[in-house]
């Protein structure tokens, strides 16, 4: 099942008991965050606040608050099915040459599908049913959440920022938080390595002093949103990838103020520009780390046009100490990364980004160890293979007999298979998340790798321990007589 717009997905969630409408008046200032946080921690439904205080536009929250709903957005029933998305990405990133004529014929449909998914331009799009320009532009009329008591101002969180570099043929879609600065101004917090910031830097170099056109889409269809947070190959647009996932081309329309293309079924579109000379102090804001972050200067986005659907819905979220919605999204996308990593490192059995580690700051990887030093090779490869792991501070490597998603198993492996000095890798002066105030310098810090695998000859001079395992025949016998023993609640082994 594919969803052409956000509304059809909302209907689907409601029909399946995955969305709750709240008619009671709730304030976007702090109250929505408290409600959404309680519901998310209870693994509850998406929320549609129908009567936000002092506003006339409903607010959608917790849309991707469980891995199940992320899978549902892509037409899947189980988050594990998201590995199919990872397999597609692994193929697109590094397609294998055909092994023969029959294999070449078999691969033609996939190549053809990938090539036939450019966005489809439509006229009279829903996102331009209402148009506001000039003095009509007033961002304060949107029910933008003020998430935490220490936040400096309301914050746009789920906007798809659309940019294009002067040397690129495709547009870039990225999600960057945006501080409300005034009726027609937002602060665009994009870090220097992100796609939008790179496009902006290229534009400034080629057209110094000129205004840079930018568009932000709020409430796009769920597949396009997820396409924007997935590690799409640099040569492919997020629109094309969303079309592949959907099985239908992504419908777009031309913005009114520039040549950028926007998702045609979006609820709200913000059009405008960035003046390269206009910067503003951004923050502080409560973030996914569970702390308020430092302030810094970022470009100001001036909004010249607001277009929207009739009866538009404002899509929002909050970030805070995990679990939050981005953490749940990270749990689901974890399944996407597994096939991508296995493509490069077939010895990887499983890969896990614990949500309590902010979904990217720690990774645990299980491998089929084949030679001394193998664990160190895999940890170095993981750090360098995908940009998404550039900020991963800790990597733990375990053997295939250890469940890398079970902390009891992982801690057992660390405490019984590691010597702290021999099996710890420390790397200094590496890229670190700017929000990580624990690093000695903003954006630069160290990484730690833990080799918690069994040690081979050459890694140790001692006889290695043999794990204790019960005789399978005895286990089978006890299983067969368990009910007769009169012991309640047999543990699952």
From Swiss-Prot:
PANTHER family: 3-OCTAPRENYL-4-HYDROXYBENZOATE CARBOXY-LYASE-RELATED (PTHR30108), FERULIC ACID DECARBOXYLASE 1 (PTHR30108:SF17)
Matches recorded under Pfam families: UbiD (PF01977), UbiD_C (PF20696), UbiD_N (PF20695)
GO molecular function list: 3-octaprenyl-4-hydroxybenzoate carboxy-lyase activity; metal ion binding
EC number: 4.1.1.98
InterPro entries: UbiD, UbiD-like_C, UbiD-like_N, UbiD_bacteria, UbiD_Rift_dom
A Gene Ontology biological process term: ubiquinone biosynthetic process
Location of the active site: 287 (proton donor)
Catalysed reactions, as listed in the record: a 4-hydroxy-3-(all-trans-polyprenyl)benzoate + H(+) = a 2-(all-trans-polyprenyl)phenol + CO2
NCBIfam families, per the entry: PRK10922.1 (NF008175), UbiD family decarboxylase (TIGR00148)
Cofactor note: Binds 1 prenylated FMN per subunit.
This protein's UniProt keywords: Cell membrane, Decarboxylase, Flavoprotein, FMN, Lyase, Manganese, Membrane, Metal-binding, Ubiquinone biosynthesis
GO cellular component terms attached to this protein's record: cytosol; plasma membrane
Designated name of the protein: 3-octaprenyl-4-hydroxybenzoate carboxy-lyase
Presence of the UniProt keyword Isomerase in the record: no
Protein's pathway: Cofactor biosynthesis; ubiquinone biosynthesis
Source domain of life: Bacteria
Annotated positions binding prenylated FMN: 175-177, 189-191, 194-195
Record organism: Shewanella sp. (strain W3-18-1)
Cofactor(s), names only, from the UniProt record: prenylated FMN; Mn(2+)
